[in-house]
Amino acid sequence: MILSRRSVLFAASGVALGAGLFLTLGTGARAQTPLSDLLARTHIHGLAVDGQDSGRLLIATHHGLHALDLDTGLTVRLSDHSDDMMGFVADPVAPGGFLASGHPARGGNLGVIASSDGGASWAKLSDGVNGPVDFHQMDISKADPSVVWGNYGGLQRSRDGGRTWEQVADAPLGLIDIAASARSVERLYAATETGLWVSDADARDWQRAHPTDAPVSFVEVMADGMIHAFILGEGLLRRDEDGGAWEQLHPDFEQRFLLYYAADPVNPDRAFTATQLGEILTSDDGGRSWRQFGTD
């Protein structure tokens, strides 16, 4: 089985900014939409608990960035920017700061875009190498947030928050997701069709981070250095970057694959995940038990 966020399997799921092209500006109140209606007409490309309001889950989609009110179950698009948002990632030290990539509605690639106001407005930071890039995988280093990784024609790295980029190395075969370390600026994790890998040499040399060669549909590193990954046949696992055994948090999601994972930075026991079935699951015990959002 070939697993990729671009595959048919997953298709149902994929600070002042200075001078730049502003893609959109917020224009006040917008219509609210039940989560079920939003998910029926789009698919998810990323999740983040709002660092400015932990009562909201931010959902990057094929049609812009939306905020889910966790009390009401209603969503609202945060700006007029309704383009396909790939590689969505929250800044680990600047609440309200985000990076994304993807495709504009008119076609082509976005390059790297950024928001510093919670997603209300976006500015283009860079075309990347051989761009405009379309980073389907992107992550900000928790060890040094000025370092950003992306994958487009190989792994690219920025050392200045996404403004300039260099081509670093070929991506591992069958790459599905990447996650930057919270311990070392040189360390990068790769979820692939043949297992979970780690490089401590700026993506130039790779070793297995988990012994199985089963597909891994996502990998995420928390600010405290805890790695989370979903491994086919094993479920949701976690382990500290500093070592120790892998802990199986939840083995059986029936026919679901977890594509994206977000934990509340204030309360890490509260977590959210998106599946290939186009649904959002929520946990209040650090990932040991899950329920579909809105079914309480």
Residue ranges and their predicted role:
Residues 104-109, 150, 231:
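Short, solvent-exposed loop/turn segments at conserved positions within beta-propeller repeat blades
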Residues 81-86, 129-133, 171-176, 212-217, ...:
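Short coil/turn segments at the loop-to-beta-strand junctions that recur within blades
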